[in-house]
Amino acid sequence: MRILVVEDSKVVSRILQHLIAQELGCEVDFAEDFTSAKKLLASHDYFVAITDLNLPDAQEGEIVKQVLAQQIPCIVLTGSLDSKQRQRLLQLGIVDYILKENRFSYEYAVRLVKRLQRNKHVKVLVADDSVVSRKFVRSLLEQHLYQVIEADDGLSALDVLNTQEDIQLLITDYNMPGLDGFGLILKVRERFTREEMAIIGLSSDDDQSLSARFIKNGANDFLKKPFVHEEFHCRVLNTLDSLDMVRRLWEQANLDYLTEVYNRRYFFSRFEPQLSTLNQKQTAFSVGLLDIDFFKKVNDTYGHDIGDEVLIEFAQRLKQFFGQHFVVARFGGEEFVVAFKGLNGSKAFTLLDKFRANLAASPIKTSDGELNITTSIGVASLTGDSLDNLIQRADKALYDAKESGRNLVCIDS
């Protein structure tokens, strides 16, 4: 990633140089005037440009038009700005403007670049039956580099959600034929939690209760049409920042800090509530309990850092092998569990034995060289008992695998 900074103040340039190096660590080119900036723009591709509005040889903001003409996102720095200039800049399509007041202003500019970097990977679905409104929202989002997908009504939006993965934000109008914004949100919330997707409602109606009704139905925020550019961007950024924070909290609570697979807490909270239904419907459900053979010897011989590398790689192989269809969790230490919903013990045994053989045949690469690692596994399937009892039976089978020589899969009888 390469950034262009156009600023005639050496003090401001030094501050930005320091902050960018500290926060972004990317390549930065500096220009003091319009002439030198044009030369740099002609010879490099830039991710974003941070430009002073008034330069010694271009007092009317010509640099902004030059940057935007080359389809480079532009963040404008200025010592002063009246309402007409502000409106003109926003209509040109800049990312944002920042008044040069103190160090916080420059920190904000650098944070904005980081947000743009993140936004490249954020998918946003816009549902609105008005082509004009939809295209306007799309243009605002694309100024901040979001990936934008359009739907012309609620039913089309549901079709998109069925086919597109990783949509993080839904922006939906209220009045739409077929399925309105409220109905769309209710259906979306049946499938996606607040940790998985954020929703912003839009409407031009004068009904003052709309904002509360949107939020009660499951939206994160509401915006009344017509809205100004800045309010829209602030609402979107705040909503996505909140989504990121909620996700981080959820991950801290439910993912293992080292291996990033699920933890014991998540495993029990997910499957304990399901167990009575699985028993009543006689749905097949099995668990495999895995233990890395002689893991203490790895730590004693090579040190705990190498031991951590082995745990991380072992967990990644489990995720690659099972994670698409089944749940992988770390129970603690070198012990992991795989939950096989829909599989009986015999089928789970077959898959786990294949994983065991693959692991034994493929050494784990560490910073201290390759290590031959094997695993012992115990399998048990649900027979009307509790989750604790099911795990205990898998643990007994795991003990049998160890006692029988390790690098084995044993199934609970």
Locate the predicted segments by residue.
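Receiver (REC) domain active-site loop signature in two-component systems and cognate sites
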Residues: 55, 176
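Conserved nucleotide-binding and Mg2+-coordinating catalytic segments in signaling enzymes
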Residues: 250-269, 290-304, 312
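Active-site-proximal structural segments of metal-dependent nucleotidyl cyclase/transferase enzymes
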Residues: 270-302, 318, 329
